[in-house]
Amino acid sequence: MLLSTYLNWASVLLTIAGAESNIDPWDEVSSFLQGKLRKLDVTNPNAYDMNDNEQDATFYVSMDYHEEEERSEYESVWQYYNENSDQDWHKSVYDKLQVSADQFNNTEAMYKLSQINLWGQYGYPHNKSVAFQYLQKFNDMTSYENSSALFDLAVAYSTGLFGTLPVDVARGLLYFQRSARLGDLKAKQVLAYRYFSGYSVARDVDKALLLYKEIAEEIKKKYSEEQWNMVFPYIESYIVRIPDFDEGLLGKGLSTVPQSVRRKKTTRPPFAGSSNLKPIGDVGYGEVVMQFKFNAGNGNPGSFVISDSEHEDRLVELFYTAWDLYKGTYTRGRDCDKAKRLLLQVYKTYDAEVKYMDNLQKFFYVKSLDLLAHMYFTGEGFERPNVQAALDLFDRSEKILEGAEISRTASEVDKGLISQYYFNNTLGALKHYKKAKESGNAHGILFYQLGKLSEKNPELKIGDPYLYMQEASSQQYLPAQYEFAKMVESNELRKYSVEDITRLYKAFVEENENIMAPHLRLGFSELLGGSSEVSLYAYAQAAEQGYEAAQISAAYLLYQLPYKFDDPPETTIERKTMAISYYTRAFKQGNTDAAVVAGDIYFQMKNYTKALSLYQSAALKFSAQALWNIGYMYEHGLGVEKDFHLAKRFYDQILEHNQKLYFAVKASVMKLQLKSWFMWLNGKELDNISIDQEQESTVVRPFFDRLVQLLKNLSRETRGDNKKKNQHRILKEKKTPSQGIMERFGLQTEDLLTMVCVLIIFAISMFFRTVAPRGQWNVRINGVNIAGGNALGEEGNPENENEEDDENDDEGRARARNNFGFGNNFDVQVFAI
C-alpha cells in the first residue's frame, strides 16, 4: 500500500511537471522502445554462449514469501537505475510513459505500463499492484473492448494476484466471458475448461464441447495444407511440471503420476563416454571432426586409426550433439541452423572414410545422414526444402548399410511422404510405409498417413481408417487428434460419449501450446532467470486455461511442502489458499499426487477434516502415500476417532499397490501393535479418542522433529542468530506451560516402550542367527529353515531328511546335552510380522 501511495504521488508530481508541455511523449517513447529488447528469453539458443556440457534445467525457487522483501527489491532496482548514468533511460522512459498515461490519458501508454509491471519488460522490476492499477484504468478508458486486456484483468480477479487484491472469481468469470465474446482464444479455453470441470460454474459438457471444437477449428486454420497433411511443425513443448525436475511432488518411489519431463538433453550410450568437443571452422557450438590418419608404419590406407588424443567414439557424440540442437531442450531452444552446419561438416569430412569405419561408426554416421536428409526434406535450417538432396542422402545411407538389417523408421516415412505428395505415387508410398510399420517402432505420422490413404483409396484395402487414425491420435500426433475427434463425433456407430469427444478436442487444443499458451515458455524462462513472481503469473494464466501441468507448477511456486526436518515456509494465507485451489484442480484432472499435497497443506493448517477428505479421494486412486496418511490419522485420532484396527487396515492396503514399501509398512504395523498392547495393559480405551482439528497438540509431533528443532535452536543461540525465530519462539513459550523432558522431545511412554520392544526383538533375532548355527539349533523363520540343515533334506526330498535325521540323531542329542543339558533337539521358530 505504501508503495502504491508513493507511485500515485509521483504520478501527480510528474503530471504537474509535465503541464508545461502540450505534446504527448508516447510517440517518442514508443519509437525508442522498439530498439530495446522487450524480454530476454534464456531458453533462446542465442541468448548465451552455452557450451555442450550444459546441465539440465537448474533453478532456485524460494520457499518463503515476504511482501517487505518484494517491496525492498523493487525499490533497490529503481535505486540502481537512478545511481547509474548508463541506465538513465529507464527512469526517463518510465516518467514519460506516466505523463502520457496520466496527463494525456493515452490508453496505449496505460497498457504498456500494465505490461511492463506485469511481466517486468525492458528490465523494469515486476510490480503487481501498479500493473493492476493501470490495467483497470486502461479497461475503463476503452469501455472494456480490448480482449487481451480483459483476459489479464480476469486473471487478476480470479487469482487476486496472490494477495494483491481480494479474489473475486465471479467477476473474473464475467471478464473471461466478455473477452471470449470479443474473440480471445485463451478466454474461450478458460470457459471451456470451467464448463468441463465444473469449476466456478455449473458443469456443462455440451457447452465445453462446443467451445473446444470452436477453438480447435480456429487452430487448424493457422496451419497451411502442406503443414497439416505432410510435415507438421515441430513444437517445443514446455508443458512440464516444475516439481518433476526434483523427482515429483511426493518424491521417488511414492509418486503415482508419470513424469512430465521429456525434452532433457539426450542421454549418451555408455560406450560414448563424455567428449570435449572442439570448434572447427565457423561451425561453432560443439562441432568436432573425428581425426582420421594413415598408419605411418606401412602407409596402407586400409589401416587408418583414430588419433590417440581423441575419443574413439567421437562420431557418436557428434550425432547426439546435432540431435540436441535439432530438437532443443528445456534450457536451450532449437537451433536448426547450427545442427545443419554440424551435420554438413560431418558429411563433408567423413563420407570418403566410410570404408574404414567399423559397424558402430557406420551406424551413427548413417543416423547423421538421415537427420540431415530429413532437414533437407522439411526445409528446417534451410531457406526452402530440397527434396532431391534429401533423396540423395537417403540413397547414400542405404548404400552404406547395404545388407544390414537396421531399422530406419523415420527415413522410410520421409521417403513415403516424398513419394505420396511430390510424385503422387501411392503404391510407392505404401511400400515405404510398410517397411516403417514392420520395424515395430512406427510413429504417429505413419498411422495418420495410412488412415488418410485408406479413406481416400478404399479399393486398395489398406485397412480401417478409423483404427489407423485412433492409433495416430493415441501417439499424440496433433493432426490425427483433430481428425480422430471429428471422426468420432460424426460416427454414430462408435460408442463414444460427449465427454470422451470433449477430451479429444481438449487434448488437441492444449497440445498446440505455441498458439494457446506461449507464456508457458516465458514462465519457464523467467524461472531460469530467477524471476519467480513473473514466472508465477505466467503459469497462473495457463493454469486458468486448464493446463494440469501449469496448475501444479503455479501451486508449487506458491507453496512448497518443507522437507522432513526443515521449518515450514513463511508465506501469506492468500498464497497458501491459492496453492490448495490449484492442487485440487489438478487432482480433478487426474493428478493423484496433487490431492495428497493439498491434504498435507490442510494437515499443517490443523484442518484435519479437509485433509482426511483429500487423502480419502487420493486413496481411491490407489495412492500409497494417501493410504499411509489415513492410517496415521486413525492411529493418532486426528480429526477422527482413534481406531487402531482401521489404522492397520489402511497400512496393510499399501502393500496391495506398492510392494516396495514392505518394510516401512511392517514397521508401522509392528509399532501399532505394540502401542495397542501397551495401552491395553494400562487399561486405556482405544475408541472415542480424537484430537480436535483446532487443538494444538504435541502428541502428533514426532520425536525426531522435536529433536532436530531443538538442535536448530541451540545452533542459533550459539551463533547469536536469534533475532526473528527465537523472538517468535519465546513469545510462544510464555503462553505454554513448562514441559517435561519427554514432552519436550514429543515422546509418550508407549512410544518409548515401543522403541525398546522393537530393539529387543531385533536383538533376539540377531542372537539366534549368530548362535544357532554353532549350537546346531533348528531355526525357522516363517517356516523356512535357516540353520541346522536343509528342512527338506537333499534336493528337497523329505525321505532324505528322515534318513539324515535317523543317522545323526544320536550325535545331535549328545551335542545338545553337552551344550545345554537338554535331551531333545532345541527348536526355535521366529515369525516375521
UniProtKB/Swiss-Prot annotation:
GO terms for molecular function: ubiquitin-protein transferase activity. Glycans are attached at N105, N127, N146, N424, N607, N688, N713. Residues 1-19 form the signal peptide. InterPro entries: Sel1-like, Sel1_AlgK, TPR-like_helical_dom_sf. It comes from the Eukaryota. Belongs to the sel-1 family. Component of the endoplasmic reticulum quality control (ERQC) system involved in ubiquitin-dependent degradation of missfolded endoplasmic reticulum proteins. Component of the HRD1 ubiquitin ligase complex, which is part of the ERAD-L and ERAD-M pathways responsible for the rapid degradation of soluble lumenal and membrane proteins with misfolded lumenal domains (ERAD-L), or ER-membrane proteins with misfolded transmembrane domains (ERAD-M). ERAD-L substrates are ubiquitinated through HRD1 in conjunction with the E2 ubiquitin-conjugating enzymes UBC1 and UBC7-CUE1. This is ERAD-associated E3 ubiquitin-protein ligase component HRD3. It comes from Candida glabrata (strain ATCC 2001 / BCRC 20586 / JCM 3761 / NBRC 0622 / NRRL Y-65 / CBS 138) (Yeast). The gene is HRD3.
